[in-house]
Amino acid sequence: MSILIDKSTRLIVQGITGRDGLFHAKKMKEYGTHVVGGTSPGKGGTDVDGIPVFNTMYDAVEQTKANTSIIFVPARFAADAIMEAADAGIRLIVCIAEGIPTLDVIKAHQFVEQKGAMLIGPNCPGLISPGKSMVGILPGQVFLEGNVGVISRSGTLTYEIVYHLTANGMGQSTAIGIGGDPVVGLSLIHISEPTRLRRI
């Protein structure tokens, strides 16, 4: 059973008109994720690869009923992007950016908790529920649908573990890279729910 994301996930890509945001928005869409919109200040009303672009997260959530966001903005803007997403009503926020000042992450994390949302990252590869949805920069082709949960602070270690699991016919329900920075949103303890995953 997948956790956090599935076929009902409706995703907004913050920073969708940037190089990384656009590249990975296309990859997530190709995987089957419902990428319902993106944000880029000043570019609202346009679209990229058939994905509508909004000026703010408030507009994006109101128009698309999104419940998840992924952040591809420069580190100096990332904390504000996290808080904007939470304030707009997003329930799950994934921050890929690295190099965000620790105090900014602490402030953003506290704000997210106050809003009742969840933060994965920063400095993380995101998460995937194989065959259902991917929110991040993971190589979807190495994953196999199954019942093993994978949780790691390291993106490359996650891929290595999953490669060997898949090669041995052990599919994954959800794989999550929680991020390698000193301060991250969800921790191993938060995510480890043995009642929902047969193996972790």
Residue ranges and their predicted role:
Residues 63, 76-97:
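Rossmann-fold NAD(P) dinucleotide-binding segment
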Residues 13, 37-40, 93-95, 118-123, ...:
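General beta-strand structural signal in soluble alpha/beta enzymes
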Residues 30-48, 179:
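NAD(P)-binding Rossmann-fold cofactor-contacting core
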Residues 99-117:
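Rossmann-fold NAD(P)-binding glycine/threonine-rich loop
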Residues 187-200:
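Residue-level detector of conserved catalytic or cofactor/ligand-binding positions
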Residues 48-63, 70-79, 187-188:
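Glycine-rich, highly charged phosphate/nucleotide-binding loops
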Residues 25, 57, 82-86, 162, ...:
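Generic hydrophobic/aromatic pocket-lining and core-packing "Φ" positions
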Residues 146-188:
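Short glycine-cluster motifs
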